[in-house]
A protein has these predicted regions:
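Membrane-interface junctions at transmembrane-helix termini in multi-pass inner-membrane proteins
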Residues: 1, 6-7, 11, 32, ...
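Hydrophobic alpha-helical transmembrane segments
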Residues: 1-34, 56, 206-211, 225-247, ...
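Helix-terminus/linker motif at the lipid-water interface of multi-pass membrane proteins
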Residues: 2-6, 68-99, 117-118, 151-164, ...
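Interhelical loop/hinge segments that connect adjacent transmembrane helices in multipass membrane
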Residues: 6-14, 28-72, 110, 114, ...
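Helix-loop junctions and terminal segments of transmembrane helices
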Residues: 36-37, 93, 97-135, 142, ...
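Alpha-helical transmembrane segments of multi-pass membrane transport and lipid-handling proteins
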Residues: 128-183, 210-221, 272, 276-279
Length: 314
């Protein structure tokens, strides 16, 4: 085992990560157990409550297992049909979009407790208001960050990586589109979790996710481009969004027409218009190279037009 550590630094790196995470978790547990009376471990017999918790946790696990399976198997498919460079491009695209999506995730994290609290207090009108508006503003926030990156992606990648793997920019652009769908799903998922009856929505969304790998395999078998894999994922994410909206309508009374207009049609119309205006504006002004000032200018133009549209809407 020790010889493996000397010969393969990657194994040593993995072991050290496990040790660090385990030690960190143990220290958290020890501190909380000593300082906080309410966090001490004790065994209490609440059979019905335990059963309900296990049921909800089980459905949540079922909904997330397909995602983990897809991540691993898609990497395997890309390695089977293409060179490792394509897999490297996929890794870069996931890294970039995860960083971009973090901004909208922070907003949704702050809204999540309010959605759950509103349902618990039977304030369903406020809960639906929060779901729709957090979806809309998540799109806007993600858009402000994404637009400058989207417009000068090749230049940014060349500055960052110098030698950019083939397909990287295509993968990132398609994955960014999927990020908008993912940020729309989160408030809906919180609303469904709040009411507790998550069996059917999580079952069908999990089933939809399971179709990603077989469909991708068929496309690659017929020698389609690797970008097809990402397009399939986006289409499935759209299907999952439809499933979430449908069950939110049934279980928590979300108006489909109101949601489609306020969280989809209107925000994305604004996004399309502002993208066009930003492109036309920046094509007529002098902005040096690919640096900070270009990104700042694009973000400023986007933010200004978003504020104008929201003021008119109010």
């Amino acid at each position: 085992m020790v010889d493996n550590f000397h010969s393969d630094r990657l194994i040593l790196y993995g072991v050290l990560i496990v040790v660090a995470q385990t030690l960190s978790q143990f220290l958290y547990w020890a501190y909380c157990n000593k300082k906080f009376q309410e966090s001490k471990l004790c065994f209490v017999g609440y059979g019905a409550l335990h059963k309900e918790i296990l049921r909800i946790a089980g459905w949540g696990l079922f909904a997330h297992i397909p995602y983990a399976i897809n991540t691993s198997l898609i990497n395997m498919l890309l390695n089977m049909f293409f060179s490792p460079i394509v897999n490297a491009a996929r890794g870069i695209s996931v890294q970039v979009t995860s960083a971009l999506q973090q901004f909208s995730t922070n907003l949704q994290t702050s809204v999540t407790p309010q959605i759950t609290k509103s349902y618990a207090m039977n304030d369903y009108e406020r809960m639906l208001f929060l779901i729709i508006n957090s979806s809309r503003f998540s799109i806007y926030l993600l858009f402000i960050i994404v637009l400058p990156v989207y417009m000068r992606l090749e230049d940014i990648l060349s500055l960052w990586l110098v030698e950019v793997p083939e397909y990287t920019s295509s993968f990132i652009r398609i994955t960014i589109i999927g990020s908008f769908l993912t940020c729309l799903q989160t408030p809906l998922t919180v609303g469904l979790r709040s009411q507790g009856n998550i069996g059917k929505p999580f079952f069908w969304s999990g089933i939809a996710e399971l179709f990603v790998v077989p469909i991708c395999y068929l496309f690659l078998l017929f020698e389609y481009s690797p970008t097809t894999v990402f397009i399939v994922q986006v289409v499935v994410e759209l299907l999952v969004l439809v499933i979430r909206v449908y069950y939110c309508n049934i279980l928590i009374g979300l108006s489909i027409s109101k949601y489609v207009w306020n969280a989809l049609v209107y925000p994305f119309s604004v996004v399309i218009v502002i993208s066009g205006v930003s492109f036309l504006t920046l094509s007529n002004i002098s902005v040096s190279d690919t640096g900070f000032w270009y990104l700042l200018t694009v973000s400023s133009v986007s933010y200004t037009h978003l504020r104008a549209h929201e003021t008119e809407a109010d």
